[in-house]
Every structure is written in C-alpha cells, then in structure tokens.
Amino acid sequence: MSNFAAQRLNMIDAQVRINDVTDPRIHAAMGAVERERFVPPAKRALAYADVPVEVAPGHYLLDPRTFAKMLAMAEVKVTDRVLDVACATGYSSAVLGRLAQSVIALEQDAELVRAACEILPAAGAANVVVTQGELVSGFKAGAPYDLIFVNGSIDIVPDALLAQLNEGGRLVAVLSSGQAEVFVREQGRIGSRAGFDARIPALVGFTKTVGFVF
C-alpha cells in the first residue's frame, strides 16, 4: 500500500467516520478518489491533512471533515444532476461524480479550469464536465439542478443560484456566520435548515449585494 493510500484510509477513519458521517457511499467515494492528484506537488504532503489546502492563490480544496459533512447534508442521490460551484482543480467534482448521475464543475479561474480538465479524466471522472464562468451566476445552460454544492464560505446565497434548483433541489453551503446550511426548493419556495458549525475560506464575490441574507 502506498503512503497516500494509507493516508486516504486514515482520512476516512479519523476525519470522516469520527465526525458522524456514516454513509458508506461517502466513505467509498472519498476513499476511491486520489486527493493528492488535485494538489500541487509542493503541497502534496498536506493532501490528507485536516485543513483546507490552497491549490492556487485564494483557491482551496475544503478540509476532508467539512467536505464529508457537507456531502452528508446534501443527501446525494444516484439520479442527481449536480452543479459544483468553485470546483478549483476538481476534487469535489470527482467525489460528487461517484455519488451522482452527472456533475457540472464550475470554476472562474482559467488556470484552474485547465488543471481540472487535465486531472479529472485521468482520475476516471467520466461523468464530470468542466466549465468556466462567474461563480455567483451559476451555469444556467445546464439547469435545473438537483443539487448545487458550494465550495467556500459565502455571505449570501445568490438568487441566480437558487433559481437554478429543480423542484426538491438542494443547495449546500457554509455561510460566513460559521454555519453550514441546506436550502431546498419546495413548491416554488426556498426553505432552509441549519447543519453544523464550520469555518472555511471565503469565496470572492458572494457579498450581500447579490442576493438575500438568510
């Protein structure tokens, strides 16, 4: 067993299961995706550390604990069509791709888009499509989505993203107040429920001027 493979198993035991993420599908998906592929060579020693990993200036992979707990909140179904917002190098998209039917990986930074387009096929993520665009606008051409997954802390949830949810669709995000929440479209209205406490790096552009404060 390689050192990274051992670290991956330890991640599941020491960062995922121990934090009340009990879904075996999440364990299997995170255990199958080689997180080190998505981290710059100089930072691969941090690939499985319980901290966000900066993959480009101001762009991060979420720490495994927070990421796993967000996946659990999302209740990803095998039939889900997913929009993965701020996918960075594509790690979150690769994991989501093992849980859902299809994933659109949205990233604003051109260099990260190029990196994700190279890494994801090599990681076997055949049901993930990478696209470049403004994060707060989502990707209307692929809507509606059953799940929108936001990889970063935000002040607000933009109306443009909520409008792209299918009936019964969920949006999972960590608010800058330090609370993870799920927003659900039901009968044309948006409701929300609080999850767990979390502090993760902020996403640029998600300010109070582009949507409602919840």
Sequence positions of predicted segments:
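Conserved nucleotide-cofactor-binding alpha/beta core module
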Residues: 75-190
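Class I SAM-dependent transferase core
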Residues: 1-83, 91-94, 99, 112-126, ...
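Catalytic, metal-anchored helix/loop core of enzyme active sites in primary metabolism
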Residues: 214
